[in-house]
């Protein structure tokens, strides 16, 4: 269950290959004024690249994709800067999310109840075109850019989740703040250079390819990402009751960096994403019934109906009683969150 450089290249390098191919095609179609092809290519690119922020950068932030730490670091910085992702801020937040999952006092990265916005036409329009305001598990161009600029100029931007959560993190870990500010400035500098290069070269589509792809066509990220915690229990110590795993088709699972095995990821956060299915099979006897994609959404919509009658309702996932004691070797795996937490949080 240890990281492997070859499998790491398949995941991180494969996603990068898609990024390069779709980027080249999008620019080509734009320069040749093949508008139908351009729109389709831009949509496919956004669908793929929307998984960079908080997914690709998230898994690389755990330091478990590659055995070679320098490769983890290199790909983390690439995926972060291209997707407006401040991995320093996120590392603080996500360390708490893993240690205090859905306990409001210690985890405000995910706060229940998560809203299902399927009945809002403007939100649906955004996730299939350009996400302006964002929403649960999707990136809005206004809040992300605003939060990045605020952090870059010394403020406490809400580029992770909320300004309140950012303030709480920085209050307790002030020494991490300079790293986040420096990275926000690098993000700002990079995307400013992209814009200036586009203006100088006349390649007007360049910012759409290198700067706004994170906010384009967030539909798949929304549909596969929202089920991970939505409608489940808060303030419980059993991951099986507050995290949901679902089965996906191979393409979606690849783009989502296998995070559909989300329960296994929370239980074994120090394990590589490409081994999560194996981990599931190893402990399947102790796990709740595995949901399908459509089954999870059906369950979520039923929970939403219950919450309209009782706002405090949370679904209590039926689970088998634990049947095996974790040995010392596996205990180390369950306790680890990889290299995610900054040194002062470990």
Model-derived features with residue positions:
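Cytosolic juxtamembrane regulatory segments of multi-pass membrane proteins
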Residues: 78, 164-170, 242-258
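Non-catalytic, topology-defining segments of multipass membrane proteins
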Residues: 1-47, 82-207, 273-346
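Active-site-flanking alpha-helical
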Residues: 22, 61, 65-66, 236, ...
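Aspartate-rich (DDxxD/NDxxD/DxxxD) Mg2+/diphosphate-binding motifs
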Residues: 55-74, 102-113
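Transmembrane alpha-helical segments that form the membrane-embedded catalytic/substrate-channel core
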Residues: 46-57, 86-90, 209-237
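Juxtamembrane/interfacial segments around transmembrane helices
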Residues: 66-73, 92-96, 123-133, 233-244, ...
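Histidine-centered catalytic micro-motifs
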Residues: 55-62, 90-102, 224-231, 255-271
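Short helix-capping and inter-helix turn/linker motifs at the boundaries of alpha-helical repeat units
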Residues: 68-70, 186, 253-254
């Amino acid at each position: 269950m240890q990281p492997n450089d070859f499998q790491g290249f398949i995941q991180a390098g494969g996603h990068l290959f898609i990024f390069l191919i779709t980027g080249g095609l999008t620019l080509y179609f734009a320069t040749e004024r093949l508008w139908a092809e351009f729109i389709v290519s831009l949509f496919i690119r956004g669908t793929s690249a929307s998984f960079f922020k908080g997914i690709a950068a998230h898994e690389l932030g755990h330091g478990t994709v590659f055995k070679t730490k320098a490769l983890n670091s290199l790909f983390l910085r690439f995926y972060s800067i291209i997707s407006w992702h401040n991995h320093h801020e996120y590392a603080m937040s996500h360390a708490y999310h893993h240690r205090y999952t859905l306990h409001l006092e210690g985890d405000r990265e995910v706060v229940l109840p998560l809203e299902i916005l399927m009945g809002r036409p403007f939100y649906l329009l955004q996730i299939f075109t350009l996400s302006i305001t964002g929403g649960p598990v999707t990136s809005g161009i206004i809040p992300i850019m605003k939060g990045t600029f605020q952090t870059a100029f010394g403020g406490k931007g809400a580029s992770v989740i909320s300004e309140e959560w950012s303030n709480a993190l920085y209050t307790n870990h002030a020494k991490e703040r300079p790293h986040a500010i420096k990275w926000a400035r690098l993000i700002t500098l990079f995307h400013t250079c992209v814009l200036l290069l586009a203006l100088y070269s006349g390649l007007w589509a360049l910012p759409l390819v290198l700067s706004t792809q994170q906010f384009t066509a967030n539909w798949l990220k929304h549909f596969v990402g929202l089920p991970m915690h939505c409608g489940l229990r808060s303030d419980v110590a059993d991951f099986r009751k507050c995290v949901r795993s679902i089965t996906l088709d191979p393409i979606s699972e690849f783009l989502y960096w296998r995070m559909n095995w989300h329960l296994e990821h929370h239980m074994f956060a120090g394990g590589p994403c490409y081994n999560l299915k194996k981990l599931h099979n190893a402990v399947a006897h102790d796990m709740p019934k595995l949901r399908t994609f459509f089954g999870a959404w059906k369950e979520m919509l039923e929970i939403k109906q219950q919450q309209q009658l009782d706002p405090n309702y949370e679904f209590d996932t039926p689970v088998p009683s634990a049947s095996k004691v974790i040995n010392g070797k596996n205990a180390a795996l369950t306790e680890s969150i990889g290299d995610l937490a900054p040194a002062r949080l470990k």
